Amino acid sequence: MNKIFFTADLHFGHTNILKHQPNRPFAQEGDYILGDLTFFKSEDARHLLEKLPGQKFLVQGNHDGSIRAYSNYFKTTSQILDLTVKPTACPFLSENLMLTLFHYPMLTWNHKPYGSIMLHGHCHGKLDEHNRLSNDLPFDVGSDGELAKKAGGLVPLELIYETAMEKTGGVSFHQYAKNNYRSEVR
């Protein structure tokens, strides 16, 4: 089984990043980076990208301007990305898991009424409590959010799944969404 990891807001090259996040994670193989990978200018960004191992999937953030010139270092680059992860890829799943990846948090997203989970960065942990208390299924995977702190760095899909299952009380995401968003469909 391949482990799937998510992160955002690494801000490589930011002058204050080590002061605020001395133990920030570094990307591994097959990671989804939800924006703000680097503050480096174009040539320094290229040098950083050359050193990162494995396949990377970039959802662009507001500080990724210089990185757009180097999209060849990523398997995909996009503004928003919808994923479906199947139990055959991750045996801990009991059903297909739909994810929407975006740098910014959203109030509504594709497939939300059908149980999709929304992963974001940008907020530097400031929406963790809101995400926890919301009936929705958004999660901040930024390097300084509570999920990253709990995981010790990169946020594994398994932790997102477990946290979301706790939030739904063990009800499938599809049924949870039907109960919370689509009462007219019951």
Residue ranges and their predicted role:
Residues 35-52, 60, 65-81, 111-112, ...:
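Metal-dependent catalytic neighborhoods of phosphoester/phosphodiester hydrolases
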Residues 9, 36, 61, 121-122:
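Active-site glycine-centered loops adjacent to acidic/histidine catalytic or metal-binding residues
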Residues 22-24, 47-52, 118, 134-139:
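Glycine-rich, phosphate-binding/catalytic loops in enzymes
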Residues 2, 48, 95-97:
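Short acidic/polar mixed-charge low-complexity motifs
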Residues 17-19, 58-61:
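Short catalytic/metal-binding and nucleic-acid-binding patches
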Residues 12, 39, 64, 106, ...:
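Short, glycine/acidic-enriched loop or turn micro-motifs at the edges of active sites
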Residues 57, 72-184:
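Conserved beta-sheet core of the metallophosphoesterase superfamily
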Residues 1-44, 141, 163-164, 185-186:
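N-terminal active-site segment of His-dependent metallophosphoesterases
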